[in-house]
């Protein structure tokens, strides 16, 4: 258990925010997405010309929540530099690679994992058919966006994401998820 009190932890994140640093350090859900979107909007309103740094250590999470973050990243007039540290898996990988081209970084021991979206389905046969249609749309949309981010083909992304595919930081650079592997903040 951490010796930090919630107020101390909050003050650390507030100090980082003042430096235009946002941290995604958990699973992506609606609450986290709303918080990150609000932070991006606040910082871009304060100064639309200065970069925002988004540090990612996340196992992934909700596609819809992640897409809210992605859309806000693209909506913001400033560049969003992304940094993969620890784990950037699933939606974490997506957001890492969605950063501004040339400003996507991974620390040397980061692990990046890509896979196809997953979803639980239930209900009537008609409901399941609708959900399956939506799932197929989401899978294709995600593959197209990741292809755009990485320079890979949609077909290659679809093939490579059929199962969990793990990358070291260097492999992630070679694949196109990130532009740089860095060991020091001075390198970014």
Curated annotation (Swiss-Prot):
Principal EC category: hydrolase
PROSITE patterns given in the database record: CLP_PROTEASE_HIS (PS00382)
EC number: 3.4.21.92
Biological processes, Gene Ontology terms: protein quality control for misfolded or incompletely synthesized proteins
Pfam families from the UniProt entry: CLP_protease
Keyword Protease listed: yes
Protein's job: Cleaves peptides in various proteins in a process that requires ATP hydrolysis. Has a chymotrypsin-like activity. Plays a major role in the degradation of misfolded proteins.
Subunit structure: Fourteen ClpP subunits assemble into 2 heptameric rings which stack back to back to give a disk-like structure with a central cavity, resembling the structure of eukaryotic proteasomes.
Protein name listed in UniProt: ATP-dependent Clp protease proteolytic subunit 1
Organism in which the protein naturally occurs: Corynebacterium jeikeium (strain K411)
Gene name in the database record: clpP1
